[in-house]
Amino acid sequence: MKIAIDAMGGDFAPENIVKGVNLAKKELSDVTFQLYGDGAKIRQFLDDETAIEIIETTEVIDFHDDPVAAIKSKKDSSLVRAVTAVKKGEADAVLSAGSTGALLTAGLMLVKRIKQVSRPALMSTLPTADGRGFDMLDLGANTENTAHHLVDFAILGSYYAENVRGIEKPRVALISNGSEESKGSPTVKEAHEILSAMTEINFIGNIESRDLLSGGADVVVTDGFTGNAILKAIEGTATVLMKEIKSAIMAGSVTTKIGGALIKKPLSGLKDLMSTDGAGGAAFVGLKAPVVKAHGNSSELAIASALKQIHKMLESDVSGKLVKHFENMDK
């Protein structure tokens, strides 16, 4: 299998991207890694060129570029060339830590959505206290969604959780302002009614945002605006929490500092639990092939995790299974 990688996308490209490939190569012996970008810069960080293809490109899409305009005008950019490789069948999947808007636009324009899926969604695996994590979608690919969009998201998320993360009968829930069936907006209530009648997924009803990190569901479905807001709140809370704990210890007495030293290992474990480095990237689900977005400031470990995530997606043929599923629904 071949994975196309935008080596020039991200805050720390190409260094962290290439070093992430070095890590992933040690575990993914059946993968050829296609690195799109400045060959000279890429080679500075490569351990060796085994299972590596370097494709020279002359342009880079910046975070401030208009996504649609950039896709059309910067056709020799590392991002566009990598996505185009998937379109042409020269690669099986694509990874980028570059512009989210540009990657989503390129995915829709070049890779194309599954015909019966009206709105693809951005989905990521987020941490929970029990270490299992949960998949949430949509995280911002769409700002407004209908009930039928949410139903599609539930199916997409359930298939991903089962086939890629190996969760048997994943519990699927809708974000709402209460767990009761009567709670929620008209859109959520309509989606709840449709999902409750479906037997192909394990729909458990509504879930409140306060229960997400305690592992109340394996797949959480919401509209893109709400999902993005929740994601940013989780990221911000985790950052502030760790910062405040450290500040409180450092500002305390000698006894407090000694206590802080004693709990350093458990705190490190908490930091690892809340870290998304091992979770992979955000998958743009609903497209005909895997398109995965890594965080702009991804570490080399996060890039390696995203590549392993893509490997699982390809190995399980989750995109192919989804295409067949939605085709059967259309009959």
UniProtKB/Swiss-Prot annotation:
It is found in: Cytoplasm. Its EC number is 2.3.1.274. It catalyses: a fatty acyl-[ACP] + phosphate = an acyl phosphate + holo-[ACP]. InterPro entries: FA_synthesis, Phospholipid_synth_PlsX-like. SUPFAM superfamilies: Isocitrate/Isopropylmalate dehydrogenase-like (SSF53659). It comes from the Bacteria. This is Phosphate acyltransferase. It comes from Lactococcus lactis subsp. cremoris (strain MG1363). The lineage of its organism: Bacteria, Bacillati, Bacillota, Bacilli, Lactobacillales.
